[in-house]
From Swiss-Prot:
Entry binding sites for Mg(2+): 101, 239, 241, 243
UniProt source species: Francisella tularensis subsp. mediasiatica (strain FSC147)
Gene Ontology molecular-function annotations: magnesium ion binding; phosphoglucosamine mutase activity; phosphomannomutase activity
Post-translational modification summary for this protein: Activated by phosphorylation.
Similarity section: Belongs to the phosphohexose mutase family.
Name this protein carries in UniProt: Phosphoglucosamine mutase
Residues where Phosphoserine is found: 101
Co-factor(s): Mg(2+)
Keyword set, alphabetical order: Isomerase, Magnesium, Metal-binding, Phosphoprotein
One GO-annotated biological process of the protein: carbohydrate metabolic process
Gene Ontology terms: cellular component: cytosol
Highest taxon in the source lineage: Bacteria
Amino acid sequence: MAKYFGTDGIRGEVANSTITVEFTQKLGNAVGSLINQKNYPKFVIVGQDTRSSGGFLKFALVSGLNAAGIDVLDLGVVPTPVVAFMTVKHRAAAGFVITASHNKFTDNGIKLFSSNGFKLDDALEEEVEDMIDGDFIYQPQFKFGSYKILANAIDEYIESIHSRFAKFVNYKGKVVVDCAHGAASHNFEALLDKFGINYVSIASNPDGLNINVGCGATCVSNIKKAVKEQKADLGISLDGDADRIIIVDENGQEIDGDGILNILAQYSNICGGTNGIVGTQMTNMSYENHYRANKIPFIRSKVGDRYVLEDLVKYGYKIGGESSGHVINLNFGTTGDGLFTAIQLLAIFSQADKPVSEFKLQGELMQQTLINVPLTKKVAREDLQKVASDVNDVEKRLGNRGRVLLRPSGTEPVLRVMVEADDKSLATNEAEYLVEKVKQKLV
């Protein structure tokens, strides 16, 4: 079981958990030393979101890397997918993002990309963890690394997207965008300006403390309200580091990551094409049934965009994502990318020329009840055997009317209990039954 890494990097409360200056410096030194061992290019890229703690954590990371002899190129405040993009483009050994994604400002963390722009696999994460727990390694003084700033990183990213989609995007509707006071602030607006989009921007004034506060992809009520007030045709909501996207139609109705994937699947010719779709264990069964009916191959991965990516590569598909809004298109990038996904959607909406509401899956979705159960410590998957018989009982009662998923959080001591059924009260009752069993046997 991983000691530091969760499903999406390392994350926690600043100064009151793993996320300290000392740890972050050791992480930089560990990765730098590993780069030396593997004879990779002695050069990495770093970026950050808008949290007040981002600056001092970044420089702790840089000091550990420089001591190990690694040169650092700092992109400043940029969305996470920009770091992945630039890591590949500039042939860096690795890319780091100082971010806690959709979490509150008191948290922070580090996301880490390998040279191909992919999140680290489990084996490489274990190597990094072993190095963190080892000695701090200094290179000889004449081999210390350098530190440089690249001010125009977002311009390279925007130009790459524009060159691919300029001929498709001609959207005439009014758009509201919610940048979560995060890394997309000003950067997303620059991208939309490049395509000539008529938009109103909200939650785009970061002060270091307001990231994700009452806004962003995990608080869709903000964008729903704004779409109605502005009489807009579309709402786009990103999270703090802009690797998630949720959209809202002209009626203020949410379309989550599952719904976005379905739109991309129906118009995959505009998005570069795909032989199938990768969702996750959380993907609503209604979409799985829809893909099957339309002869679109569909695979469920474990939750986490790194696992979506692994299955995209394994099965040779190009498009995948999560209900939460991580959407990956391997025709362009290697990680969840809210900005690029937004442009793909604007291209589709431009070409199809119908209201956003008409792109939604018709009919009622299966009803999901998700309950987070706090635990005293992180639970391993083998611990779930203690409630296996209870899960089996629920599955028997549901029959072919639904399904059950128990999933330990990868970032905190929480067990997520999800029951999906064709009736909301049935899903809720069975979920509450399982929560009681979990509290009796695991808490």
